[in-house]
């Protein structure tokens, strides 16, 4: 059998896979439910409680012809998906909007109160925190927790959407992209996790650079194959270099800016209350107990830091953080709670150890991010955001499962060296003292990080592009 062009080949291959799935589907019931009562969370640091309850301005009885399913597979991706959903519900006529978070239970979406919105799928917190690909241990923990079974059930849900005239928006990397491709629906793909900055221009190098250079993109051949589907109506990348490299492969990828920068405040309305202090933001991550290990590492390092002024340490906590446990760790490291001291920047409590003050606040990341001079950060999304605000940061990798040495080095390369990765306590202290005392060095790092992360305003452009190319 001969095919006139590559699109016919793709359609034949998709039809072949679809027939296999149909056979599998006959052997299993169709699963679909809206999850309303799951309450635990592992959201990106500081985002969830800052989001107001969102009411729909969309008329469910309008003549909208499409329903939309958004599939996302990461905590940062959940935040991007939330912004897309908010804009859809307020501006665009759609029958129904559904979201399927593939990592965690998607509690961040509970702030949306609309009759034509729902969370669907089999949602649960994974033992690895969603990083089963980082280690064999993480994969095995997720496997025995039922990850593969739940993924297959979610897969069957997605396969049932084509007959209901759904459009799909995949946010993430391979898994949501594959789900969108196998659905038989037309789809858009927002590929945020991968960037060609990680292999093309340093700092440093890794063995994987040769592999990516050979491919010409950090996106793998099987992912590029899925992107070439005639049902893929728009591709959006996190930065210009990644989009351009895909364009060289005759793939029409667009770059509108990084939507991660749309979710942090750029104003410092209360910073005057702490402007006379050296200011440090401590980002320990949102996955426990890893976050507690990160906190202990940072507190041990801060014991020996020598600076001229008193130090304000901003410690924003994620919505799922156990504040009592955090306070116990502060106490174990020599900090005492100061009930009569207030800095009036939204803190829940103040802790002191000699010339260092720690301000503790739940869901205050958005409010505090732009108040710091330097960050100590063992996290993913939040580190990228403070870098985009022009704040250099330092990391010291731990045991994981998320923030391992390889993760930290990749992140540093992604952000052009704006995150300094340290191997030990002494190196971290030396780098921190330099950053707190040398303004010229900070300015150099600021320019690199801000350029890599891009400007605000990408979310609106992304939604407009998807609406034009997928929904009309």
What are these regions (language model features)?
Residues 47:
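Histidine-centered active-site/metal-ligand motif
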């Amino acid at each position: 059998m001969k095919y006139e062009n590559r699109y016919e080949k793709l359609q034949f291959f998709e039809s072949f896979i679809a027939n296999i799935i149909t056979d599998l589907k006959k052997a299993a019931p169709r699963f679909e439910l809206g999850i309303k009562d799951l309450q635990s969370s592992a959201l990106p640091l500081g985002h969830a409680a800052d989001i107001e309850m969102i009411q729909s301005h969309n008329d469910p009885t309008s003549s909208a012809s499409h329903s939309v399913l958004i599939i996302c597979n990461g905590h940062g991706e959940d935040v991007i998906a939330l912004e897309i959903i908010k804009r859809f519900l307020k501006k665009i006529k759609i029958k129904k909007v559904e979201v399927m978070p593939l990592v965690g239970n998607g509690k961040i979406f509970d702030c949306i109160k609309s009759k034509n919105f729902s969370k669907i799928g089999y949602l649960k917190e994974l033992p690895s925190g969603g990083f089963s690909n980082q280690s064999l241990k993480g994969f095995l923990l997720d496997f025995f927790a039922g990850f593969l079974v739940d993924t297959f059930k979610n897969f069957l849900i997605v396969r049932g959407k084509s007959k209901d005239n759904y459009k799909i928006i995949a946010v993430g990397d391979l898994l949501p992209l594959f789900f969108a491709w196998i659905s038989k629906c037309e789809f858009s793909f927002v590929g945020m996790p991968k960037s060609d900055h990680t292999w093309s221009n340093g700092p440093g190098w890794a063995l994987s650079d040769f592999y990516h250079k050979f491919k010409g993109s950090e996106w793998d051949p099987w992912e590029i194959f899925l992107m070439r589907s005639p049902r893929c109506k728009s591709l959006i990348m996190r930065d210009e270099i990644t989009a351009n490299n895909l364009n060289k492969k005759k793939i029409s990828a667009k770059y509108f800016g990084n939507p991660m920068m749309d979710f942090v405040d750029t104003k410092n309305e209360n910073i005057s209350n702490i402007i006379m202090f050296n200011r440090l933001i401590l980002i320990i991550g949102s996955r426990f107990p890893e976050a507690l290990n990160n906190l202990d590492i940072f507190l041990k390092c801060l014991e020996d830091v020598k600076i001229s002024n008193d130090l304000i340490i901003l410690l924003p906590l994620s919505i799922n953080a156990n504040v009592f446990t955090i306070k116990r760790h502060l106490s174990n490291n020599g900090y005492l709670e100061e009930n009569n001291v207030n800095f009036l920047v939204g803190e829940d409590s103040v802790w002191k150890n000699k010339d260092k003050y720690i301000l503790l606040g739940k869901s205050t990341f958005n409010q505090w991010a732009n108040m710091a001079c330097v960050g100590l950060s063992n996290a993913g999304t939040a580190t990228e955001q403070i870098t985009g605000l022009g704040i250099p940061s330092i990391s010291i990798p731990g045991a994981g499962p998320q923030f391992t040495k390889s993760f930290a080095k990749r992140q540093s390369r992604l952000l052009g060296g704006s995150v300094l990765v340290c191997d030990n306590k002494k190196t971290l202290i030396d780098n921190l003292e330099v950053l707190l005392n040398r303004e010229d060095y900070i300015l150099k790092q600021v320019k690199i990080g801000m350029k890599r992360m891009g400007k605000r305003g990408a979310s609106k452009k992304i939604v407009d592009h998807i609406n034009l190319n997928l929904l009309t």
